[in-house]
């Protein structure tokens, strides 16, 4: 394997794939970048491999596990920080296995490294189970409940900013495969984000029950209040807090006391960044 393969893949991952295909924020990309700075420094200091000599064959499951232990034992990082670094590595090696099939076997081994469980205490982040519990709260026998499920599930699915959700129109949704949504972000920049089949089911149900698949529906926002006006940031926050409180009553250990719309976005960036193709 040529030495250039690793640096080129890392550069493509950080400068093209994450901002382009995944639409990751600059803060998230910066966090990933720091992960690789730490990894490269570790490989030089503890393995004697100069950065310019580092190749994929040096990055084995064993070396990654040693790096994670180094973060905790030497740098005194928390389990949470360790998991953030591992999530970044998972995202990279998931990307690599499609770009460099020759590395598929070792990539799979690295991807098998599990996130570490922290000691039990007050939860301050959302988990898979927490998200599932939250999304099970809306009453689907009511129009408002159907709307709220579609709203929360969409925020979870695509990791959109609150303002991007507020500005959505029915035409923003591509309801035929491949399912996508067009988000208008800061600076009026548009990005196309794929949607999971499960989310499209919720959206289609909501849109059909509210006439949002009809031509005239473009007069209205996708998510609106009783006056057919756009939901506000405060309104969406109220919806999230309402169902978080309900979910917390079901299981206090799964829903953090402090939860925000940004929490859902962070969840998507943290856990979903690894899905590549």
Show which residues each predicted segment covers:
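Conserved catalytic core of the tyrosine transesterase superfamily
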Residues: 1-277
């Amino acid at each position: 394997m040529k030495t250039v393969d690793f640096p080129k893949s890392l550069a493509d991952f950080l400068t093209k794939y994450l901002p382009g295909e995944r639409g990751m924020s600059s803060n998230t990309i910066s966090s990933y970048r720091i992960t690789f700075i730490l990894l490269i420094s570790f490989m030089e200091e503890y393995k004697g491999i100069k950065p310019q000599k580092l190749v994929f064959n040096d990055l084995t499951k064993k070396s990654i596990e040693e790096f994670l232990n180094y973060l905790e034992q030497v740098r005194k990082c928390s389990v949470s920080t360790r998991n953030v670094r591992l999530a970044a590595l998972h995202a990279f090696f998931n990307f690599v296995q499609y770009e460099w099939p020759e590395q598929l076997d070792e990539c799979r081994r690295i991807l098998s490294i599990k996130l570490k469980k922290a000691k039990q205490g007050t939860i301050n982040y959302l988990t898979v189970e927490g998200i599932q519990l939250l999304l099970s709260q809306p009453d689907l026998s009511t129009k408002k409940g159907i709307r709220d499920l579609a709203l929360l599930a969409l925020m979870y699915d695509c990791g959109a900013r609150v303002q991007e959700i507020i500005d959505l129109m029915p035409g923003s949704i591509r309801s035929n495969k491949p399912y996508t949504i067009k988000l208008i972000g800061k600076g009026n920049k548009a990005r196309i984000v794929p949607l999971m089949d499960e989310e499209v089911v919720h959206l289609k149900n909501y849109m059909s029950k509210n006439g949002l698949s009809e031509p005239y529906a473009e007069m209205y926002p996708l998510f609106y209040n009783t006056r057919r006006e756009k939901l506000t940031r405060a309104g969406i926050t109220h919806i999230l807090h309402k169902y978080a409180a309900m979910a917390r009553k079901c299981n206090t250990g799964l829903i953090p006391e402090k939860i925000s719309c940004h929490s859902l976005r962070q969840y998507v960036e943290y856990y979903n960044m690894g899905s590549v193709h």
